[in-house]
Amino acid sequence: MSSETVSYFSHPFPRRQSVGVSVGGVIVGGSAPVVVQSMTNTDTADVDSTVAQVAALHRAGSEIVRITVDRDESAAAVPKIRERLERLGHDVPLVGDFHYIGHKLLADHPACAEALSKYRINPGNVGFKDKKDKQFADIVEMAIRYDKPVRIGVNWGSLDQELLTALMDRNQAEGAPLSAQDVMREAIVQSALISANLAEEIGLGRDKIILSAKVSQVQDLIAVYTMLAQRSNHALHLGLTEAGMGTKGIVASSAAMGILLQQGIGDTIRISLTPEPGGDRTREVQVAQELLQTMGFRQFVPIVAACPGCGRTTSTVFQELAQTIQEDIRRNMPLWREKYPGVEALSVAVMGCIVNGPGESKHADIGISLPGTGETPSAPVFVDGKKVTTLRGPGIAEDFQKMVADYIENRFGLGRKIAS
């Protein structure tokens, strides 16, 4: 995994120092960059569909992918999925998402236990009453046996009710009781920390434990992760559960995680979006990357800056060109990462009129200022801050696309290395 450090602007808060955890060779926490991960929504027993979706998520940039392991058929499929992915060249860590019977599935399917890179345990449903600690311990012991890390993932929708009830009763006995919301937040944090302490007592190292505490409200998420960060040095997995569809899910997740990341809290993130019918699952990976890149913490793809448009830009040419360039970059990035090291740092500007167009284009590595309404039908192009040509005629878009491709080849390609 890349260990780049990016600083578009100074970070007002130091990064929280957590214990690094290796997940199939991808380091989460410590001094490693914040990791992007995602989860499939296929039936894991359907090997073909799951392999296809994991491969798509990995190509999109997901550095870790979680899959559901909910029954014998799913567990039996995991080694086949792992083998098929490796044959296709996708060496991506797979995380097994276990609920209720994870201890049994891992025991009954040792090949599954070996093929997974991490186990996810939910303290709220790993077992109930007198079976809870035993079944939790069984999974932890499996992790120790197979040298795998675990994520202890608390979720407010399946919170340990015994713990919550005990805290509620204790709170009522206080002279100045806390609100029910505050007690719930405390229960979530305690569930994670108590489970982590138990895992360590069983023998799992702190460098094998990642914590998460997922809720569906932005302020709750900020509160519980701030508490976790203050009370432990475990690596933290950020995620807003049930964030929702479309812009609502994107805004809610970005608002919550952006605040935490800005405070130095968070070692890996997943943007949980409810896909629209027929929607692309890789969208959540793209949003996670854009969040980290926009905040200046990582670089994944070249930035395409474009003006929002106004009454001076009634033509849609600049919008269409910006979209085409962005889609072309996304489509080619898997190849470009290998062929053009450092291409992630490229910036492209596609502007729509003379007001800010030339200035913005000069600030990009390569930029074009297209004519606005009533302006001369010509488009100056700037490379590394200098005007190099003016494009005219109906082929402006195609000509600029070729210039972008040539710039990438000349700056990041093999020819540059030979010349240097």
Curated annotation (Swiss-Prot):
One of its GO terms (molecular function) is 4-hydroxy-3-methylbut-2-en-1-yl diphosphate synthase activity (ferredoxin). Coiled coil: none annotated. Keywords: 4Fe-4S, Iron, Iron-sulfur, Isoprene biosynthesis, Metal-binding, Oxidoreductase. GO terms for biological process: isopentenyl diphosphate biosynthetic process, methylerythritol 4-phosphate pathway; terpenoid biosynthetic process. Its EC number is 1.17.7.3. Pathway: Isoprenoid biosynthesis; isopentenyl diphosphate biosynthesis via DXP pathway; isopentenyl diphosphate from 1-deoxy-D-xylulose 5-phosphate: step 5/6. It catalyses: (2E)-4-hydroxy-3-methylbut-2-enyl diphosphate + oxidized [flavodoxin] + H2O + 2 H(+) = 2-C-methyl-D-erythritol 2,4-cyclic diphosphate + reduced [flavodoxin]. Signal peptide: none annotated. Converts 2C-methyl-D-erythritol 2,4-cyclodiphosphate (ME-2,4cPP) into 1-hydroxy-2-methyl-2-(E)-butenyl 4-diphosphate. Belongs to the IspG family. This is 4-hydroxy-3-methylbut-2-en-1-yl diphosphate synthase (flavodoxin).
